[in-house]
Design a protein with these regions (language model features):
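Charge-rich, low-complexity N-terminal segments
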Residues: 1-70
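Ordered, soluble secondary-structure elements with a strong preference for glycine-centered loop motifs
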Residues: 28, 92, 96, 134-141
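Short, ordered beta-strand-loop transition motifs
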Residues: 48-55, 77, 115-120
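Long, continuous compositionally biased terminal/linker segments
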Residues: 62-88
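Short, internal acidic amphipathic alpha-helical interface segments
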Residues: 82-123
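Well-ordered alpha/beta subsegment
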Residues: 111-141, 145
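Short, highly charged C-terminal tails/helix-capping segments
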Residues: 159-165
């Protein structure tokens, strides 16, 4: 009888663990909402990727000044969603000279942040905060359009600064 009770307890614990795993994460809910919005509005060219359990992303491209730039929409379990555009890869010599101009851009456009990642890529990041129940995929895609408009205006000046040094 004691073994029977123990077996039932183990089965109940296993059932609880399974239920917890089935519960959809906030990141997955955000990604699903973005995919449904993109499908409903016939937005193509999107690749859905899972980096790990916490970070999911949409990989796409932006055409700016004749260049095809990688754009990632990163969702996770935090209140933030990130737009990350990878603009150019710098050599070691170009990094120091470019940082000053990137700081100027950061001061001019507070909602955007230019940085250089460890691989030497100049990355433009746009953070979009939204509470769990306030996530709006339409806003995310509208901000992708704003990011593209910003790059259409400022990308050539950035590239001139980089290649002139």
């Amino acid at each position: 009888m004691a073994e029977e009770i123990k077996d039932n307890e183990v089965k109940e614990e296993a059932a609880e663990v399974t239920e917890a795993k089935v519960e959809e994460t906030l990141a997955m809910k955000k990604l699903t909402a973005l995919k449904e919005f993109a499908d409903a509005h016939e937005i193509g060219g999107l690749q859905y990727l899972q980096i790990n359990e916490e970070n999911l992303l949409i990989n796409t491209r932006l055409l700016v000044e004749g260049q095809t730039l990688p754009l990632f929409i990163v969702v996770n379990n935090s209140v933030y969603t990130y737009l990350q555009a990878h603009l150019v890869t710098l050599t070691e010599e170009k990094k120091a000279a470019t940082l000053s101009y990137l700081n100027e851009l950061n001061n001019e456009f507070n909602m955007l942040k230019y940085s250089i990642n460890p691989q030497g890529n100049v990355v433009l990041i746009f953070s979009i905060p939204a509470g769990d129940d306030k996530f709006d995929p339409a806003l995310v895609f509208a901000l992708v359009d704003q990011l593209k408009a910003h790059l259409d205006t400022h990308y050539s000046a950035l590239m001139e600064k980089i290649w002139s040094k």
